[in-house]
Amino acid sequence: MCTIGTLRLGRHEYLLFKNKDFGRDSFADQIFLSEDVVGIQGVSTWANSDSSQDQFSGFSIGANRYGLFCCDANVREEPATGWNYDLLTEIALREGTDVESAIKAVDRAVGRHPYWCSNLMLVDGVTSAAIEVHGSEIAIERHTERLTRTNHHLLFGARPMDEDTITTESRLSFSRERLTNANSIEDIQGLQASHDSNDKTTGICNHSAHQTVYSYILYCKDGEMSLLVRQGRPCSGSVYHCLTPPIGNQWSQEGEALFRSSYPSDSLV
């Protein structure tokens, strides 16, 4: 389960955030890097307790050289013939140069083959959008300033067979409330670590059936991109690693090596 969202901080300043929740208490990210795109690889086996069975495909979150950011959140693995929605995040970043062209790329993709139900979040230097994916259909919500989603559809509607029917609505409420008053990266970091539920076991930071295993903030100001990433529960006091994605004008083999060696993931050490 995941909580995702966007926030515009100024005319040339914006961010995308994600808390990644898994059916286990730890996880090691895999990275894809090229001159054009950086992506944290998606995994279709997020609910499994056995990491040896993980199947990676697509991107869970990423950015491209044009300053387009995209991430996703699971709703349910329906239809049965659907493909992993992480592939749509990769398509958006490989084929899109901005939010609108990325939406068109996703629409073309679901027209060719159905994908599992999910929420995608996109932001660029002008606007942001949430794409709700429902098999071979999509629905769009646009907002210039801020958006958030969890693990159910708002435009298509929640369903009893959704993967999370327990925490998704409360997490959305908590995220919306905090995002309304957010005006800095520090506010988003506070949101990611928050426990606003009465029993403190969940909130945006999740300690319930699913555990928050990574927190991400992709940030752009005046064309300069950075990735703030933290492994483990964000309320635990662990620090964010601030990395410069080596894409576009920043691309070099040395930059790629530095990014990989600095990224908090046991599998990359």
Residue ranges and their predicted role:
Residues 1-94, 115-118, 123-269:
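C-terminal, well-structured catalytic/ligand-binding subdomain of enzymes
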Residues 5-7, 102-106:
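Conserved catalytic-core segments centered on acid/base and nucleophilic motifs
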Residues 91-104:
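A gly/proline- and charged-residue-enriched helix-loop-helix capping module
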Residues 105-115:
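Phosphate-interacting basic helix/loop segments used at nucleotide- and nucleic-acid interfaces
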